[in-house]
Amino acid sequence: MLLAMYEDPQGRTTPGLWGRIACAWAVAFAALHFFWALGGSWGLSVSAGPLAEERPGWFVAVGLWGVGLLCLVGGVLGWLLAWPRPRGRAGRMVRALGWCACAVLLVRGISVEVLLLTDTAGQGMDVSPEQRLWTLLLWNPWFLVGGLVFGLAARGSGKAEGLSSGAA
């Protein structure tokens, strides 16, 4: 259905789809953070280590609620990237923010991956083997996927011509 909504004259799927995928990625990440903020624990212990058990107020407020809200802002950005870009400064701003989201997510994913694989941070980081494994196999790839999706959405921003009318 989504693919049928955005087709260019040559019959290829246009990049507007990537904006919708970026939106879904961000909203899913927000939902997970809100689940954790409300007391859920699935996956948090291997992500946040001791903070997951202690749950200090600053961690819940900033690390869970704050990040969840930031992810919702990312969802709005992904949605905006899916639609025809407004002319002028607003359109350039949306696209620039898409590229910024791409860069931040890729840098975060790659840098943490490199730090964990090379053990550059040393023993001072207090990262358990279980945390390291889940971070390398699940969390960092999630950031890398998000970065790639936002990059593809920003690259194609403004190229979508809107919903096809169904007429050939």
Tell what function each PLM region has.
Residues V60, A96-C100, S128-G146:
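Individual transmembrane alpha-helices with interfacial aromatic-anchor signatures
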Residues A24, A30-A31, G39, R55-L80, ...:
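Core segments of alpha-helical transmembrane spans in multipass integral membrane proteins
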Residues D8-R12, L32-L64, R85-P86, G122-E130:
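Interfacial loop at the N-terminal end of multi-pass membrane proteins
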Residues L115-L116, G122-M125, Q131-R132, S165-G166:
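Mitochondrial intermembrane space
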Residues P141-E161, A168:
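Membrane-water interface at the C-terminal end of transmembrane alpha helices
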Residues H33, G75-G78, V112, F150-S157:
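Structural signal for membrane-spanning alpha-helices in multi-pass inner-membrane proteins
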Residues A28-G40, A103-D119:
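C-terminal TM-helix exit segments that contain a strictly Trp-centered aromatic cap at the helix terminus
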